[in-house]
């Protein structure tokens, strides 16, 4: 079955839709890619999607976390070594670049790579050769390099901790993965996806989430992004004693960190009273406007966020006089 990018990168926010389209275009090209995004946004998922949609899809995809391997071992891990190259090298060993030959290697957290090793990586990108530690022979490899970082490598270049020539060689195509707080409209979709996976593992247990709890998840900023949301849904499902995740189950830090969806209305009663219809219309207008902002102008996603049918949402939109961003909304009408 062909790899489906939309199943790996779930969401309907314009940012994720554009990302999926970019992956499709980049996958077929034999260029290096630099993926930047906060921790937990899914940079490895993006890299794997590029690999799986590329002509190299039947070959190896080798992820390497440069921050998780001690600096003195990273060169040997990546390039391999000859017997006796260093203390403990009892035999020769291929490196991960050779393992990824004809496939793709992901160098995650590449900003942690020692600057001396960066020069050796640059030669791989320019000449396509790998020289194991302790060897005077170079081996030719055909490997696509994708790099990822949760920090701005441009700043690292300015500080002198990252080679400028390697930086430009890596970001032939730069990809930025948006944090989850910038595409809140996808939180219900992601939550349901994670719950569905849990249901598949435990088919006898049907777990749902209350509307109030979903609003709290939507309102939270998720500093750990999609990974944090996934872990939270898993945790809540495990601790759920019945079939519904409700507000009482949410941790205090999540509830406290959830921002109000819209500013409160300040109502002052006087002798003449208030016009309740006008107040309701004003509140509806604020909520609709906030939902449209969070969904990038996507009416369908905004309607779902507010629990409304599309026709009802459109009617309220007209009644409240809210103008949706036309440039974004046109893409969903086609």
Please give the residue ranges for each predicted region.
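Base-recognition residues in the alpha-helical recognition helix of bacterial helix-turn-helix
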Residues: 52, 119, 123, 131, ...
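Conserved RecA-like P-loop NTPase ATPase core
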Residues: 19, 41, 64, 78, ...
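Nucleotide-binding/hydrolysis machinery
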Residues: 2-17, 21-24, 54-59, 134-144, ...
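Short gly/ser/thr-rich secondary-structure transition/capping motifs
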Residues: 84-91, 127-132, 155, 268-271
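AAA+/SF3 P-loop NTPase mechanochemical coupling elements
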Residues: 60-65, 91-102, 106, 114-120, ...
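Conserved post-Walker A coupling segment in P-loop NTPases
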Residues: 8, 15-87, 98-114, 142, ...
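Bacterial C-terminal helix-turn-helix
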Residues: 48, 268-334
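Conserved helical "switch/dimer-interface" subregion of ABC/ABC-like ATPase nucleotide-binding domains
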Residues: 22, 53, 81, 120, ...
């Amino acid at each position: 079955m062909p790899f489906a990018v939309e199943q790996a990168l779930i969401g309907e926010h314009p940012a994720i839709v554009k990302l999926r389209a970019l992956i499709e275009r980049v996958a077929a090209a034999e260029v290096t890619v630099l993926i930047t995004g906060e921790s937990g946004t899914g940079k490895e998922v993006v890299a794997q999607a590029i690999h799986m949609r590329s002509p190299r899809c039947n070959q190896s995809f080798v992820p390497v976390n440069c921050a998780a391997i001690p600096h003195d071992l990273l060169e040997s891990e990546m390039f391999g070594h000859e017997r006796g190259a260093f203390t403990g090298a009892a035999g020769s060993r291929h490196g991960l670049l050779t393992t990824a030959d004809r496939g793709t290697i992901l160098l995650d957290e590449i900003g942690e790579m020692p600057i001396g090793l960066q020069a050796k990586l640059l030669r791989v990108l320019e000449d396509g050769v790998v020289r194991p530690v302790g060897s005077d022979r170079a081996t030719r490899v055909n490997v696509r390099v994708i790099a990822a970082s949760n920090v701005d490598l441009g700043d690292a270049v300015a500080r002198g901790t990252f080679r400028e020539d390697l930086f430009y060689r890596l970001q032939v195509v730069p990809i930025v993965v948006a944090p989850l707080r910038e595409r809140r409209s996808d939180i219900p979709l992601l939550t349901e996806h994670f719950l569905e996976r849990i249901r598949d593992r435990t088919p006898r247990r049907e777990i749902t989430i209350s509307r109030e709890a979903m609003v709290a998840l939507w309102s939270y900023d998720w500093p750990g992004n999609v990974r944090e949301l996934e872990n939270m849904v898993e945790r809540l499902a495990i601790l759920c004693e019945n079939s519904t995740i409700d507000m009482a189950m949410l941790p205090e830090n999540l509830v406290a960190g959830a921002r109000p969806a819209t500013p409160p209305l300040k109502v002052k009663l006087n002798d003449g009273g208030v016009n309740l219809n006008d107040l309701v219309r004003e509140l509806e207008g604020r909520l609709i406007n906030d939902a449209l902002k969070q969904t990038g102008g996507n009416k369908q996603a905004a309607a779902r966020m507010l629990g409304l049918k599309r026709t009802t949402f459109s009617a309220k939109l007209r009644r409240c006089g809210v103008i949706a961003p036309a440039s974004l909304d046109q893409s969903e009408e086609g």
